[in-house]
């Protein structure tokens, strides 16, 4: 299983490189990313969150939305954004136990390549749209806390630094 990179970490700030072609190595990575995401009880995971500088993310919103199957998105691009927005609470596997309310567009159209090198187009809304936007932010070096006020962002970063110190101490034992 892959290790999830915890914030703050500079690897989470890198704008990821596109993939020219999905090969068996990338398909194995995608499979391992799904295993890691499920183990952490997540609904999305981006390659930089496991230390990989590639424009790949996975989502599985399950029965919560119109998309019933897990999806891997490679080199995704949002091609249309509806003007209506909603505010919902978001979390992130790189920020365990930290949540914040964010405003995001309700509906998007995203084009991407799947794990079989097939071009895909998806129109999605609500929760799935939000998850895709969150993961797309990750591969662009943007974190969900970047959408918050400076004060809220600084509080979460301080708590994460403390959390990482505690984890490192327990790992040393």
Where are the language model's segments positioned?
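Positively charged
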Residues: 1-173
């Amino acid at each position: 299983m892959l290790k999830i990179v915890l914030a703050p970490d500079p690897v989470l700030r890198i704008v990821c490189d596109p993939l020219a072609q999905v090969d068996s190595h990338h398909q194995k990575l995608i499979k391992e990313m799904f295993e890691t995401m499920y183990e952490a009880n997540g609904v999305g995971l981006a390659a930089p969150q496991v230390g990989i500088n590639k424009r790949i993310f996975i989502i599985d919103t399950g029965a919560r939305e119109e998309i019933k199957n897990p999806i891997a998105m490679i080199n995704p691009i949002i091609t249309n954004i509806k003007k209506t927005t909603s505010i919902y609470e978001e979390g992130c596997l790189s920020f365990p136990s930290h949540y914040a309310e964010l405003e995001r567009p309700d509906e998007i159209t995203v084009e991407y390549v799947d794990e079989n090198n097939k071009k895909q187009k998806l129109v999605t809304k609500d929760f799935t749209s939000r998850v895709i936007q969150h993961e797309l932010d990750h591969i662009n070096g943007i974190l969900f806390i970047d959408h918050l006020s400076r004060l809220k962002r600084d509080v979460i970063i301080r708590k994460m630094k403390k959390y990482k110190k505690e984890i490192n101490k327990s790992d040393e034992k």
